[in-house]
UniProtKB/Swiss-Prot annotation:
Its main location: cytoplasm. The keyword Cytoplasm applies. Nucleoside triphosphate pyrophosphatase that hydrolyzes 7-methyl-GTP (m(7)GTP). May have a dual role in cell division arrest and in preventing the incorporation of modified nucleotides into cellular nucleic acids. This is 7-methyl-GTP pyrophosphatase. It comes from Hahella chejuensis (strain KCTC 2396). The lineage of its organism: Bacteria, Pseudomonadati, Pseudomonadota, Gammaproteobacteria, Oceanospirillales.
Amino acid sequence: MTNKSPHPSIILGSTSPYRAALLQKLNLNFQQAAPYFDEQITPTSLAPRDIAINFAKEKAESLREQFPDHLIIGSDQTAALNGLLLRKPGDKATAIKQLAACSGESVTFYSGLALINTRLNTTRTCVDWQTVYFRDLSREEIERYIELEKPYDCVGSFKVEGLGISLFEKIEGKDPNTLIGLPLIELITLLKKEGLRIP
């Protein structure tokens, strides 16, 4: 008979070094795994906040069979400008166009979380948000920023963990980690419900 640990091991369903750095703040042992999920398939009938939750859950679910005795964390981020979904730009021209649209506007970012306990077959989900108020950006500022950071794989066309902060006038929300894609305050709540002691 084997003795199981009181809590399953933790899997972060993301290869992002930024999300990993955030999770390390909680002083937990974990490993990263790439989810099997195509983000290009976006249900247009859902609101941006619901897409973030659904994608987070699907990312975690995609790792269920690979990690049958674990706590799997899935996360996803969406953004909305005037109610319209913003996607990852993918290239320079689209990034410039996206930031130009955001100039002087407010954009709400939603970070969905899913925590699957594959030992107990339970799933917990939540979403957190941040509203970013962009400064009035000149074409020169936008092009210079895009050239420096090349944020082509980032929702909103900026990297808040880098020079992207220079584009903002202010940020509203309860957890600054949400903009990087892993809302730690909400995650701590989910992990505590699984019996983990933090701190």
